[in-house]
């Protein structure tokens, strides 16, 4: 017969959520930093095109 599982504690739930939030915060900071460097023209981490026409030509 099926038995209900025990409830997850608030501490465990909050710990898991904080790990997820820290990971998301790190990704957001990294993407913002990359966007700033692209706008300033100082990026060296990847190759990209400055012209929109080159992006969509197949």
Swiss-Prot record:
GO molecular function, one term: structural constituent of ribosome
Compartments (UniProt record): Plastid, Chloroplast
Keyword Secreted among UniProt keywords: no
Region (Disordered): 1-23
Cited NCBIfam families: rpmF_bact
HAMAP family per UniProt: Ribosomal_bL32
Stated name of the protein: Large ribosomal subunit protein bL32c
Organism for this UniProt entry: Trieres chinensis
